[in-house]
Amino acid sequence: MTIILGIDPGSRVTGYGLIRQQGRQLTYVASGCIRTVVDDMPTRLKLIYAGVSEIITQFKPDFFAIEQVFMAKNPDSALKLGQARGVAIVAAVNQDLEVFEYAARQVKQTVVGTGAAEKAQVQHMVRSLLKLSANPQADAADALAIAITHCHLSQNVLRMSEGRLNLARGRLK
């Protein structure tokens, strides 16, 4: 049994989602958002670090997966996102977790089937895959999708290393 923590970083709202993987079975553990309502960036970063550290201490995940930075239209937004990612990653590394990073398009492709999926589609698929009674908050759903992506992609790598991955014309069968 493995617990995966997925993080959808943001300077104002950082989503988190935890799932349990047992073989191919995925089970919902917890999810939510770390909200930073203060204006100054150093305090926001401190709150994100403390929140992620607390989640890691409470749930003791085996793996930490986080969304990669994408090129935003506004360079200032991209820098703030990078800082939020940085403190979340430091929180994980300080507790000896290996960090895995996934691009947003890769997460959407894995969970929804298209890299151009809308947030509502991600929420719907996360709800369906984890058998939830309601759609999770958008940022929490993204974090759960990141954790799901880690499970699926790490399973494929494991199967490849064991020589059990079936490929036809370069695609998974």
Curated annotation (Swiss-Prot):
Mg(2+) 2 binds at residue 67. It comes from the Bacteria. Its EC number is 3.1.21.10. Mg(2+) 1 binds at residues 8, 139. Its cofactor is Mg(2+). GO terms for biological process: DNA recombination; DNA repair. One of its GO terms (molecular function) is DNA binding. GO terms for cellular component: cytoplasm; Holliday junction resolvase complex. It holds the Pfam family RuvC. Keywords: Cytoplasm, DNA damage, DNA recombination, DNA repair, DNA-binding, Endonuclease, Hydrolase, Magnesium, Metal-binding, Nuclease. Gene3D superfamilies: Ribonuclease H-like superfamily/Ribonuclease H. It catalyses: Endonucleolytic cleavage at a junction such as a reciprocal single-stranded crossover between two homologous DNA duplexes (Holliday junction). It is found in: Cytoplasm. InterPro entries: RNaseH-like_sf, RNaseH_sf, X-over_junc_endoDNase_Mg_BS, X-over_junc_endoDNase_RuvC. Disulfide bonds: none annotated. Its main location: cytoplasm. Belongs to the RuvC family. This is Crossover junction endodeoxyribonuclease RuvC. It comes from Serratia proteamaculans (strain 568).
